[in-house]
Amino acid sequence: MIVIVTGMPGSGKSKIVKEFEKRGFPSVSLGDIVREETLKRGLELTKENVAKVSIRLRQELGQNAVAKLAVEKVRALLKGSQVVVIDGVRSLDEVGTFRGAFPEENIIIVAVHTPPRQRFERLKARGRHDDPQTWEDFEERDWKELRFGIGGVIAMADYMLVNNGSREEYEAEVKKLVDEIISKL
C-alpha cells in the first residue's frame, strides 16, 4: 500500500508521516528529493535555489519529474514494508506517475487542511530555510503550490483531516486515521 500525504505548507502533513514512521513504515519526501537534487547540482540550499531546481526538473523531465525521481526509492522500500508513505505530492501528474509505476498497489491519498493564518504562524516558527517570514511571502508560496496543482490532489483525497483545533486534538485524529488505514492491510 502507498499512502500519499498532501496539503499546503504548514498544514500538518509531517505529523501523519511521523505517525506512520513510529509504527515502522518508511516514507519518501518529494521535497527532500528536490533538496538533494539542488545539492547534487552544486547549489547552496536556499529558497531561491530549491525553487529554481524544482522548476528546472519539471522543464527537463516533465511536470511529474520529482515523482519520477522517487519511484525507485518507493519500489525499494516496498520490498521490505507493507506500507510506504509519500510526503509532498503536489500534482495529479505526480499521483498518476505513482499509479502507473505501482498498478498492483492500493494507493490512498490523505489531505490535510489548515486555515492559512495558522499555517503562516507555524511556518514562521518552524524556521526552515525556505519558510516564509512575511505574509506576502506566504501568499506567494501558496499561489505557487496551487499553480503546481496541489488543489487537484487535495480534491481527490480519500481522507481529509481538518487541522484547526489543538495539537492534542489533531494528534488524536492522526492516530485514528493511521489506525483505520493500517486496518485495511
Swiss-Prot record:
Keywords: ATP-binding, Nucleotide-binding. InterPro entries: NTP_hydrolase-rel, P-loop_NTPase. ATP binds at G7, M8, P9, G10, S11, G12, K13, S14. SUPFAM superfamilies: P-loop containing nucleoside triphosphate hydrolases. It comes from the Archaea. Pfam families: AAA_17 (PF13207). The keyword Nucleotidyltransferase does not apply. One of its GO terms (molecular function) is ATP binding. The keyword ATP-binding applies. PANTHER family: DEPHOSPHO-COA KINASE (PTHR41930:SF1), UPF0200 PROTEIN MJ1399 (PTHR41930). HAMAP family: UPF0200. Belongs to the UPF0200 family. This is UPF0200 protein TK1334. It comes from Thermococcus kodakarensis (strain ATCC BAA-918 / JCM 12380 / KOD1). The lineage of its organism: Archaea, Methanobacteriati, Methanobacteriota, Thermococci, Thermococcales.
